[in-house]
């Protein structure tokens, strides 16, 4: 029997506000445990939550970016459950009236085709605290710094049909929230987390199979691996006559397997009811229009523009628009170079990205600025510097040795473009290698590269390669 995979993702994006969703406590990551929780976050008696207006604006911004409906009226609800790091005994969330409904995101498939993934809803909620199991010798410590941190939960339709599609959707959403500057997307710090609902069904069957929810998916790679394992587990179970149980499963990163965590809860298990301490959220058209004015150029729009305006291949445009910082860096560098977009793209993708990856830096932390990269491109274009020399200059700039012109002068890398000087080197290379000359003229054309190498070696790598090729061709073929 052939099986079809059905996947829906629930993404929790931590909103990039300075203070929490219902209190004035800070949201900075990495502080000492329990130093950033106020009485509201701790659920102490006599205090009331006050909604952070910036959280609402961020949700609207996201909704507009995915072409969703912004609800004119949404309501907060209490989601009741017990957990040690949930001090109030309930989580303030949104249930039947979320702030964002509908919407979609287009992803690219492995074959280059595009697929539209529906977004069911996006709602606002507060995060819980964090249970710490290490270093407590059989006990559990609770850190409530994270309690009350604003989250937006983005729920997709069950439109994803493979683990690869799920990873592509997650990456696309990750790029979008960073472009919108509503979430920093730091997965190591838990700012962007994913739960996946997955089931399988016979191909052609309309009814969904029994689903399992997967937790602990904090990287794109883990999402794909966990889903691959779970799909295979469910198919093996069904084909051996067993039944899939609706449950929550945890992905074990070390073993590469999912294991049962608890029976999957239904909505009625949480006894949702409207939050009595918060008024409904009213969003008028004026606020939506105000937020719309702040929308940046979105990733898909920017990628298309890079292809059209700069003449870049689709792959290059995709790499350069992967993050807003990357795209801005590229455009500033192109402007500084005098408009040489393709060479700028090549240097950025080959040299800059390699050095960033090697040193574990974000592009905003690069010691080579857009202006420096643009000037380096300009020196290659005006033939002051060879393409090979550009790599040496980049390495020196990365090491903090100065601007391109300064490095070129200091290291003596200025390219030789004087025709008579290059011609003398060409004549010398031919005269010093009569045997190779005879073989070349006898039809061994691969020796052309040998002569190019001899000239470049004699010039210390400074001779203009194009001129070397032209003069050699003329003299070897014409003499």
Swiss-Prot record:
Alphabetized PROSITE patterns for the sequence: GATB (PS01234)
Keyword Ligase tagged: yes
Database matches in InterPro entries: Asn/Gln-tRNA_amidoTrfase_suB/E, Asn/Gln-tRNA_Trfase_suB/E_cat, Asn/Gln_amidotransferase, Asn/Gln_tRNA_amidoTrase-B-like, GatB, GatB_C_1, GatB_Yqey_C_2, Gln-tRNA_amidoTrfase_suB_CS
Keywords, in A-Z order: ATP-binding, Ligase, Nucleotide-binding, Protein biosynthesis
Superkingdom of origin: Bacteria
EC code: 6.3.5.-
Reactions it catalyzes: L-glutamyl-tRNA(Gln) + L-glutamine + ATP + H2O = L-glutaminyl-tRNA(Gln) + L-glutamate + ADP + phosphate + H(+); L-aspartyl-tRNA(Asn) + L-glutamine + ATP + H2O = L-asparaginyl-tRNA(Asn) + L-glutamate + ADP + phosphate + 2 H(+)
GO biological process entries: glutaminyl-tRNAGln biosynthesis via transamidation; translation
Gene3D superfamilies for the chain: 1.10.10.410, GatB domain, N-terminal subdomain (1.10.150.380)
GO function terms (MF aspect): asparaginyl-tRNA synthase (glutamine-hydrolyzing) activity; ATP binding; glutaminyl-tRNA synthase (glutamine-hydrolyzing) activity
Family matches, as HAMAP family: GatB
Family statement drawn from the similarity comment of this UniProt entry: Belongs to the GatB/GatE family. GatB subfamily.
Matching NCBIfam families: gatB (TIGR00133), PRK05477.1-2 (NF004012), PRK05477.1-4 (NF004014), PRK05477.1-5 (NF004015)
Subunit note: Heterotrimer of A, B and C subunits.
Name used for this protein in its record: Aspartyl/glutamyl-tRNA(Asn/Gln) amidotransferase subunit B
Name of the gene encoding the protein in the UniProt record: gatB
């Amino acid at each position: 029997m052939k099986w079809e995979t059905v996947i829906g993702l629930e993404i929790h994006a931590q909103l990039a506000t300075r203070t929490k969703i219902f209190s004035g406590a800070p949201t900075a990551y990495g502080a000492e445990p329990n130093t950033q929780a106020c009485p509201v976050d701790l659920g102490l008696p006599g205090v009331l939550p006050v909604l952070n207006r910036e959280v609402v604006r961020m949700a609207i911004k996201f909704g507009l970016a995915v072409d969703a409906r912004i609800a004119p009226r949404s309501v907060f609800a209490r989601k009741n459950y017990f957990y040690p790091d949930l001090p109030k005994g309930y989580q303030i969330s949104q249930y039947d009236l979320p702030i964002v409904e509908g919407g979609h995101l287009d992803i690219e498939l492995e074959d280059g085709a595009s697929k539209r993934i529906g977004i069911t809803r996006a709602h606002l909620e507060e995060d819980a605290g964090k249970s710490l199991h290490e270093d407590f010798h059989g006990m559990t410590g609770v850190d409530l710094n994270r309690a009350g941190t604003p989250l937006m939960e983005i729920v997709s339709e069950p439109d994803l049909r493979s683990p690869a599609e799920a990873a592509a959707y997650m990456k696309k959403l990750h790029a979008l929230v960073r472009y919108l500057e509503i979430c920093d997307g730091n997965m190591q710090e838990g700012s962007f987390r994913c739960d996946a609902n997955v089931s399988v069904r016979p191909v052609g069957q309309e009814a969904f199979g029994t689903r399992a929810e997967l937790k602990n998916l904090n990287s794109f790679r883990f999402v794909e691996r966990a889903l691959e394992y779970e799909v295979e587990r469910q198919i093996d179970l069904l084909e051996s006559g067993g039944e899939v149980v609706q449950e929550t499963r945890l992905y074990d990163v070390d073993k590469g397997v999912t294991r049962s965590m608890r029976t999957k809860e239904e909505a009625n298990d949480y006894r949702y009811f409207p939050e009595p301490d918060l008024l409904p959220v009213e969003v008028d058209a004026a606020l939506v229009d105000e937020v719309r004015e702040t929308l940046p150029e979105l990733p898909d729009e920017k990628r298309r523009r890079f292809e059209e305006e700069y003449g870049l291949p689709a792959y290059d445009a995709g790499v350069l628009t992967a993050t807003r910082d990357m795209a801005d860096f590229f455009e500033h560098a192109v402007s500084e170079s005098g408009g040489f977009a393709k060479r700028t793209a090549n240097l950025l993708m080959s040299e800059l990205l390699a050095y960033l990856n090697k040193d574990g830096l974000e592009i905003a932390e690069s010691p080579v600025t857009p202006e420096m990269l643009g000037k380096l491109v300009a020196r290659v274009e005006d033939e002051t510097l060879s393409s090979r020399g550009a790599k040496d200059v980049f390495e020196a700039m990365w090491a903090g040795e100065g601007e391109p012109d300064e490095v070129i002068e200091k290291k003596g890398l200025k390219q030789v473009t004087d025709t008579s000087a290059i011609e003398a080197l060409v004549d010398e290379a031919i005269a010093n290698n009569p045997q190779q000359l005879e073989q070349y003229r006898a039809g061994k054309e691969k020796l052309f590269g040998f002569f190019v190498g001899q000239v470049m070696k004699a010039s210390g790598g400074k001779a203009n390669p194009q001129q070397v090729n032209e003069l050699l061709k003329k003299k070897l073929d014409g003499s």
